[in-house]
From Swiss-Prot:
The active site is at 327 (proton acceptor), 328 (proton acceptor). GO terms for molecular function: histidinol dehydrogenase activity; NAD binding; zinc ion binding. InterPro entries: Ald_DH/histidinol_DH, Histidinol_DH_CS, Histidinol_DH_monofunct, Hstdl_DH. One of its GO terms (biological process) is L-histidine biosynthetic process. The lineage of its organism: Bacteria, Bacillati, Bacillota, Bacilli, Lactobacillales. Its EC number is 1.1.1.23. It comes from Lactococcus lactis subsp. lactis (strain IL1403) (Streptococcus lactis). Its cofactor is Zn(2+). It is an enzyme of class 1 (oxidoreductase). Substrate binds at residues 237, 259, 262, 328, 361, 415, 420. Binds 1 zinc ion per subunit. Changing residue 38 to E: In strain: IL1403. HAMAP family: HisD. This is Histidinol dehydrogenase.
């Protein structure tokens, strides 16, 4: 199942394939989403309700758009206390990690009377998109909501599509309850994204949209970006495992498949110094996959977008990883902590054989909303800082402005901006 990749002189080619798995948006999809967004922008609730009926089969109107307290209670009754305990523990773990990301306000008081500084302010209102149906992920609710809560976002609303019965997945309701999210709208798809981006008669406009979705949701987020902020446009998931001869083959195989089961476009790559380990991992893959429900998806993704790269030494392994910039990076070597400084590009790093990537998907504390497709070279995972904006300010007394007067005027005139220069000089005309 696990093919060996010859990377000698082909690293750029490998990276291109690894990073080129993004689902291409067809002209038809893009055109359809543009029409939906324009319709919502122009016709508000009327268009929103029509699309909900057309795509989801739910006959939504102003009276049943919001999840009521009674509906929440009915859904929550289906959740046992142990699951609530797990959700609360997950939230606590995420909070403990993310509270260290809180932005700071600061100021500088100079002897000449100048005051400069930065003010950290949370976004006012954020929308969390949560996919509906059987593939609902309550962990994503917590991963997106906790950083926003810690940042101090005043209002978090949730949008999620429902089927004809109008019911929201109980696990999603439970996660929302644990996070204190009170407002849940029963709409989704591109129409839901457009509704929170532009606002309708019933749904308020937000400052930022976060959360995963299908190609229509992702395209709508991309189109609406600029009108509203978004988290990122995520592609298929990926994991890269760096391992030496001390690593356990069965652990590596299990971790590769854990990522591969997400999607047929998911990528699971092993980079190792041991050819023997590649053979052992392949044997484990073939053995373990027999008992897994998503076997077809796993085999397809590993066959088409997985593989093993054998390198001469561990430094070469990190060079490969830094070039690929994986969403998830596992380091399974004899001394993994000492090799942390070698890592330049990765969405999130999992160090040692008892820190498997799925722990990070749920309860390690780090966020699982991460850059994909090589974008970890310039993007970070979701954090508190994504829900904070920074306002800079400065105060200059007249005598200090006088000291800068000629330099600023000269600079402005060199750029042909004489009104800029005049803004400075006019303050000294009376002198």
């Amino acid at each position: 199942m696990l093919k060996q990749i010859d990377y000698q002189g082909k690293l750029e080619e490998i990276a291109e394939k690894f990073q080129g798995r993004k689902t291409e948006v067809s002209k038809e999809v893009n055109k359809t989403v543009q029409q939906i967004v324009a319709d919502i922008q122009k016709n508000g609730d009327t268009a929103l309700f029509n699309y909900a009926k057309k795509f989801d089969g739910y006959d939504v109107n102003t009276s049943n758009l919001l999840v009521t307290r009674m509906e929440r209670e009915a859904g929550l009754e289906q959740i046992d206390e142990d699951y609530f305990r797990i959700l609360r523990r997950t939230k606590s773990q995420i909070e403990e990690f993310h509270k260290h990301q809180l932005g700071n306000s600061w100021n500088i008081f100079k002897e000449n009377g100048v005051i400069m500084g930065q003010i950290a302010r949370p976004l006012e209102r954020v929308a969390l998109y949560v996919p509906g149906g059987t593939a609902a992920y309550p962990s994503t609710v917590i991963m997106n909501a906790v950083p926003a809560l810690l940042a101090g976002v005043k209002e978090i609303i949730m949008i999620t599509p429902v089927k004809a019965d109008g019911k929201v997945n109980p696990n999603i309701l439970a996660a929302a309850e644990v996070c204190g999210i009170e407002t849940i709208y029963k709409v989704g798809g591109a129409q839901g994204v457009a509704a929170v981006a532009y606002g309708t008669e019933s749904i308020p406009k937000v400052d930022k949209i976060v959360g995963p979705g299908n190609i229509f949701v992702a395209t709508a987020k991309k189109i609406c970006y600029g009108v509203v902020d978004i988290d990122m446009i995520a592609g298929p998931s990926e994991v890269l495992v760096i391992a030496d001869k001390t690593a356990k083959p069965k652990y590596i195989a299990a971790d590769l498949m854990a990522q591969a089961e997400h999607d047929k476009l998911a990528s699971a790559i092993l980079v190792t110094t041991s050819e023997k380990l590649v053979q052992q991992v392949d044997e484990e893959l073939n053995r373990q996959v027999q008992n897994l429900e998503r076997r077809e998806i796993i085999e397809s993704s590993i066959r088409n977008y997985g593989g093993a790269i054998v390198v001469k030494n561990i430094d070469d392994a990190f060079d490969v990883s830094n070039q690929l910039a994986p969403e998830h990076l596992e380091v399974l070597t004899s001394e993994p902590l000492t090799q942390l400084p070698k890592i330049k590009n990765a969405g999130s790093i999992f160090i040692g054989e008892y820190t498997p990537e799925p722990l990070g998907d749920y309860m390690s504390g780090s966020n699982h909303v991460l850059p994909t497709g090589g974008t970890a070279k310039f993007y970070s995972g979701l954090g508190v800082y994504n829900f904070i904006k920074y306002l800079t300010y400065s105060y200059y007394p007249k005598e200090v402005l006088a000291d800068f007067k000629e330099d600023v005027e000269t600079f402005a005139k060199s750029e042909g901006l004489t009104a800029h220069a005049n803004s400075i000089s006019v303050r000294f005309d009376e002198m």
